[in-house]
Amino acid sequence: MARAFPLERVRNIGIAAHIDAGKTTCTERILFYSGVVHKMGEVHDGAAVTDWMAQERERGITITAAAISTTWDDHRINIIDTPGHVDFTIEVERSMRVLDGVIAVFCAVGGVQPQSETVWRQADRYSVPRMVFVNKMDRTGADFLKVHGQIKDRLKANAVPIQLPIGAENDLKGIIDLVENKAYIYKDDLGKDIEQTEVPSDMVDLVSDWRSKLMESIAETEEELLEAFLENGELTIEQLKSGIREGVLKHGVVPMLCGSAFKNKGVQLLLDAVVNYLPAPVDVPPIQGLLPNGKEAVRPSDDGAPFSALAFKVMADPYGKLTFVRMYSGVLEKGSYVLNSTKDAKERISRLIILKADDREEVDELRAGDLGAVLGLKNTTTGDTLCASEEAIVLETLYIPEPVISVAVEPKTKSDMEKLGKALTSLSEEDPTFRVSTDQETNQTVIAGMGELHLEILVDRMLREFKVEANIGAPQVSYRETIRASSSGEGKFARQTGGKGQYGHVVIEVEPGEPGTGFEFVNKIVGGSVPKEYIKPAESGMRETCESGVIAGYPLIDVKVTLVDGSYHDVDSSEMAFKIAGSMAFKDGIKKCNPVLLEPMMKVEVEVPEDFLGSIIGDLSSRRGQVEGQSIEDGQSKVQSKVPLAEMFGYATQLRSMTQGRGIFSMEFSTYEEVPRNVAEAIISKNQGNS
């Protein structure tokens, strides 16, 4: 089957921003103007096409990354609308991993906000080219150039306006295109009757000034353009367009556009910019991966290359399990068999789907550069590679953050107990930041996630989708344990019961690992003191002990273990004996390595009227917070601080009462830090049942 759109005319883009910057409304307008929907859906009415989960429509926020295909100017545009709430950061993370370009939406009033910075960092992590759309230009206090300054200062980006608003707030009449040096005046409320005209006389000087700045910025991106600029004193429209595109692809330029999605202004020009400036799959570097022999390899964006794809999202569906894939190379055909190289398992491709939010179109194949979904894969989860069996490769996977908060879940009835297991399995398959475990002491089921809202939504989904009624415990902090010193450990398990005995013996060295490595195991056995078949069981015993910690029952992180010696018995040694010996050695070593407790620290930004600044700082300090910065703008104070999550429960209520309801705050995970000794002692004592 021939390709519907050449790869050069495909755009895989994401729309990402801080909560309430207007991402979903922006997506809705794109769908309206490109003809996918014929009636606009509004987020506040619960009718947005991309907000298809019940909780999204009720809360007016986007929780999952919805994928939609549309067309514009003879280009295929695949769009992912991502959530802005920090609790759903994995949705943004996995979207960034599979996109070629991003539209970062900023509120013209709020400007750069904490989650905007998080999204920007995520785009940096995956080197995603981007452009900026300053939305809500119709709102009181809207200021395009103020946002431009904030993006340059706070995000350290070379933001270059390629548009200017004509008017602002209630007087937003249209948009100046600085590249074409033209004005677009909106004549109707639907944004379809647009008059292209000359720049208004009262804006000629301002436009001339910003157009010169645009030319200077673009000239600096390429030597040829700089020569042309110095020779002629200006750049042609074509030179400007090609220069902006090159600048975006090389991460040297971030074009800035403006408008009001809600008031239907600026969306068609935004679509033009997506086509003109954001990359096609062939414009970005080919995806890298590892071959079975451990060598690095790349897969070019080409239908003729061996098939490779990344599963970036798994979702429960009435017809079975939907696995969203980004096609990187080759062709995937319905009815074929492929390899899941991450799990070394074969998968059959029963049905292929292209999604239009909650609508779908079945197709016979997906090609390089496509975003689509596969129905009915058995073994594939988020971050897995699918590839041709004869051309195996494992692609770079996703960064998955650790959960920071947990609650106990207790089903109300026996039938709920049976349904709970099914619900938790399904939800954890969909969301890698949602973890399920069993408390060894109480035998309770414990669920962990990225924040209170994250867990609240998941519990709500258990009730709605799986009909599970459960009692939910109070939120608990997900502490971690680590070590600060190095030592050795030894474990010898020897037991004689009747005939065959049990014997396993290992000697290890334990030391702090690199931050973010979790548990690292190195085998340095020489001469066969521990046979090869017993090394994996010994490691397994250590890993399991790692999960339950040694001082307070929390998982151990950033620990490096080296297996250096041991002994075995020809008759009595077994895998189980070495697993137990490994666990014993690990406990022995860790106790001598100065184990400490770590707690999640949150990056907290509070915005309050100036009068309340003193009491807010005092309150944050009383919560063991460290104030890292503050600023005052237009009578509003912003305080940036780092506060332990354990001290932040109930903060929203406290902030409301301290500021008469006029304060707002945002919170996101920052890092794990050591718990002060007096606090740690209380936590350890409580967990050991001594309090």
UniProtKB/Swiss-Prot annotation:
GO MF entry, a single one: GTP binding
Keywords: Cytoplasm, Elongation factor, GTP-binding, Nucleotide-binding, Protein biosynthesis
Segments forming domain tr-type G: 8-282
The keyword Cytoplasm belongs to this UniProt entry's keyword annotation: yes
Intracellular or extracellular location(s): Cytoplasm
Chief location: cytoplasm
A GO CC annotation given for this chain: cytoplasm
Domain of life: Bacteria
One example of a Gene Ontology biological process annotation: ribosome disassembly
Residues binding GTP: 17-24, 81-85, 135-138
Presence of keyword Nucleotide-binding: yes
InterPro entries noted in UniProt: EFG_II (IPR041095), EFG_III (IPR009022), EFG_III/V (IPR035647), EFG_IV (IPR047872), EFG_V (IPR035649), EFG_V-like (IPR000640), EFTu-like_2 (IPR004161), G_TR_CS (IPR031157)
PANTHER family recorded: RIBOSOME-RELEASING FACTOR 2, MITOCHONDRIAL, TRANSLATION ELONGATION FACTOR G-RELATED
Similarity field: Belongs to the TRAFAC class translation factor GTPase superfamily. Classic translation factor GTPase family. EF-G/EF-2 subfamily.
Function noted in UniProt: Catalyzes the GTP-dependent ribosomal translocation step during translation elongation. During this step, the ribosome changes from the pre-translocational (PRE) to the post-translocational (POST) state as the newly formed A-site-bound peptidyl-tRNA and P-site-bound deacylated tRNA move to the P and E sites, respectively. Catalyzes the coordinated movement of the two tRNA molecules, the mRNA and conformational changes in the ribosome.
NCBIfam families associated with the record: EF-G (TIGR00484), PRK12740.1-3 (NF009379), PRK12740.1-5 (NF009381), PRK13351.1-1 (NF009891), small_GTP (TIGR00231)
Name of the protein in question: Elongation factor G
Organism: Prochlorococcus marinus (strain NATL2A)
